[in-house]
Regions:
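Carbohydrate transferase catalytic cores enriched for Leloir-type hexosyltransferases
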Residues: 1-265
Length: 265
């Protein structure tokens, strides 16, 4: 049998989970890892966690990355770009972040970064709202940033590429991820990425992205400013990103999975 483990965030950051849920997840994941013939980890970071938390032999674990929908690599028509801008009432200039708006994703750092960026730079945050979202928006109101933040909770999946494409940068300040598919989506579209250090995001973003501490809003703003002020850098990051994501193509992933299953026959 083969089991795929996306992350062990419930052990790495237990404060984000209820005790009962942690206990159930720990039992299920540990048992699955012990009895599987092979384990697929979606990042080297997840592989290390499986070894560290469950004491699993590293040779039993294969790292096979994830990819994203092919539509993110397709050309976006001007008509689609205009339609999406109008439908979602997008600002002229913005950076984008995508993912459930929960505390682990660290939306507050992206909001705080606006304090150090030009007044015409906005933040578009795409994802399901949680109680944490309200907490962040209260902070935004205190800082006079409400008008520069655009929360989109119900975005059609096929509209995501155009939302990314209109952004000047994608920011992903999450404290911890198993991989980071939104980063792959953004690079496939062709926009620069600034992500957080501390988990697997360097694996997803590769050498062409910028990385900052998830606890340093000024550093996040400085990285975004580099992109805004250096068109050559922004273009180079976009090209490197498109090249890097080729390793996450469905052909590469399918080949790796087939090889893994063949090895067990």
């Amino acid at each position: 049998s083969v089991v795929t483990i996306h992350d062990l965030i419930f052990l790495r950051y237990p404060q984000f989970y209820k005790p009962a849920d942690r206990a159930i997840y720990t039992w299920k994941f540990h048992r699955a890892c012990r009895y599987a013939d092979k384990i697929v980890a979606v990042s080297e970071c997840t592989k290390r966690d499986i070894v560290d938390f469950f004491g699993i032999d590293p040779s039993k674990i294969e790292v096979i990355y994830q990819g994203c929908g092919e539509m993110f690599a397709q050309e976006i028509t001007e008509a689609d770009a205009i339609r999406v801008r109008q439908e979602y009432n997008l600002p002229l200039r913005y950076m984008i972040t995508v993912g459930t708006l929960e505390s682990r994703k660290n939306l507050r750092e992206a909001v705080e970064a606006l304090l150090y960026l030009p007044a015409d730079m906005h933040l578009v945050a795409v994802g399901r709202a949680t109680p944490y979202t309200e907490e962040v928006m209260r902070y935004a109101a205190q800082q006079g940033l409400t008008s520069r933040i655009h929360l989109l909770h119900k975005v059609a999946y096929h509209d995501l590429p155009a939302l990314y494409k209109r952004a000047e940068a994608m920011v992903y300040p999450s404290y911890f991820e198993g991989f980071g598919i939104p980063i792959i989506e953004a690079m496939s579209v062709g926009i620069p990425v600034v992500a957080a250090t501390g988990s697997c995001l360097e694996e997803a973003g590769g050498p062409g992205s910028l990385y900052v501490s998830p606890d340093d809003a000024e550093a996040l703003a400085a990285a975004v400013s580099r992109i805004l002020n250096d068109k050559e850098l922004a273009a180079e990051m976009a090209v490197q990103g498109k090249e890097y994501v080729q390793r996450f193509s469905k052909e590469v992933i399918a080949s790796q999975l087939l090889s893994l299953y063949d090895s067990l026959l």
